[in-house]
């Protein structure tokens, strides 16, 4: 991607961009695959060691193109409330200040 940004070689930016995830709003139309859950945590009962995890996942691509990164978001269910609700940071929902996290691939 960085070798041809609208005809300009921006590859000098690659090390800086790859260093840390980008927290920003992601347009749902930019997502090339189905989504999948990688972790389910009960925040009422979880322990410190529960957040150190690995997860196998599979993504089904909707069309053939180059993948530049992975997009992460979370959904939090407040199911014990009088009126249960879900806070979703998905790019398919109304935006929140939490945004999404982009993990760029080399």
What would you call each of these model-derived segments?
Residues 1-106:
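Class I SAM-binding transferase module
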